[in-house]
Amino acid sequence: MKQISNSLRNSNKIPIWFMRQAGRYLPEYKKVRETTKNFLDFCFDVNKATEVTLQPIRRYGLDAAIIFSDILVLPSALGWEVDFKENIGPVLKQFKSQKDFQYLQRDSNNKLENVFKIIKKVKEKLPSNTSLIGFAGSPWTVMSYMLEGKGKRDFITSKKFVYENKILAKDLLNFITEKTADYLINQAKSGADILKIFDSWSGVLAEDDFTEFVIEPTKKIILKVKEVFINIPIITFPKGAGLLYEKFIKEVPIDILAVDQMVPLEKMKEWSNKVIVQGNLDPVVLLTNKEIIEEKTYKILQGMKGKNFIFNLGHGILPETPPENVEFLTKYIRLYEKKNSNSTF
C-alpha cells in the first residue's frame, strides 16, 4: 500500500486522505467539471477524471488518491437507467419485479473499461510514495438506490420490498454482489493499491437484515477479491452501523474499518487492537475555524496515538468546505507527527 502501509509500520506517521477529497469544494475541480454537462459522462472521461483525481494530491500532498467516480457507475454500466439531476441528485429507474432483470446486462466490463483506464493513467502520474484507492458501492447501498429510484434517508421502499419479496431481493443482492467483486478485482488488476467498499445506507437496517444484506455480501466480495489478490488491503465502511459495527468486525474479514463521526473514540481505540481503523472527524468541523479544527483533530490524534489508524473524516468533504481549512488540517496533522516524534508535543 506504499505510503499508507509504510506509515502504519511507523507509529509516528499518520496516513491521511479524505473521502470526497476531489470534488465541488475545489475551484480547480469546478473548472474541469463545468466542461461536461452529464455527471456520468464526466466520471467516464479518462482525461478529466484523471485530472480531478490528482488535484487534491497536488494541493495537499495526501498519502492516498481515490479514483474520481461514483458508486452508481456500476449499475449504469450494467445497463440500468441512472441519471444525475442538478439540485436533485441521482434518479434511477425503479426495480420493481422479476421482469426488471431483463434490463441488467451480465457483462459490464466494456462500459467500465474507461474506469480501468483512469486507474492506469492516474497510477502513471501519481507520486511513487502515494497509494491509489479504487472503490465500489456495497451491494445493499446500490440495491437500495435501484429499489428507491433515488437517494432517501429512511429507505422505506427498499425495506418493504425485501420484506415482501425475499427471494427476488436475494437474487438481486447476489447479482450485484457478484458484479461488485468482479469490478473491484478489475480495479486491482488495473493498478489500485487499496480497495474500498462504501455502504452508505447500512445504518437503516435492523440486526437480522444487517447480517443478511450487509455482512454476508461484504464477506463474499472480500473473499472473492482475496482469491485473486490475497494481499490487497480492503477498506469497509458500514456507515451508521452503530452497535452493529462490533458484529461487523467479528464476522467480516476486515483489513481496514472506516467509521463515521458517531463512533466514540474509546470504541475506535478498542477496535484498533483488531483491525486498522480509519476516521472520523465530523465533516462539519471543516466548515468552522482553525481553533475548532485544531481542538477536534487533536482529540482524535491523541486518542489514537500509537494505534493502527488512518486519519480521515466520518464522511465526505462537504461542497461548501473552504479548501484552506483542508490545507490547515493536513498541515496540523503533519506538525503533530513531527512534534510527537520528538516527544515534545
UniProtKB/Swiss-Prot annotation:
It catalyses: uroporphyrinogen III + 4 H(+) = coproporphyrinogen III + 4 CO2. One of its GO terms (biological process) is protoporphyrinogen IX biosynthetic process. Pathway: Porphyrin-containing compound metabolism; protoporphyrin-IX biosynthesis; coproporphyrinogen-III from 5-aminolevulinate: step 4/4. PROSITE patterns: UROD_1 (PS00906), UROD_2 (PS00907). Its main location: cytoplasm. One of its GO terms (cellular component) is cytosol. Its EC number is 4.1.1.37. The keyword Transport does not apply. It is found in: Cytoplasm. Pfam families: URO-D. Keywords: Cytoplasm, Decarboxylase, Lyase, Porphyrin biosynthesis. GO terms for molecular function: uroporphyrinogen decarboxylase activity. The record marks 70 as: Transition state stabilizer. Substrate binds at residues 20-24, 39, 70, 145, 200, 315. The keyword Lyase applies. NCBIfam families: hemE. Homodimer. Belongs to the uroporphyrinogen decarboxylase family. Catalyzes the decarboxylation of four acetate groups of uroporphyrinogen-III to yield coproporphyrinogen-III. This is Uroporphyrinogen decarboxylase. The lineage of its organism: Bacteria, Pseudomonadati, Pseudomonadota, Alphaproteobacteria, Rickettsiales. The gene is hemE.
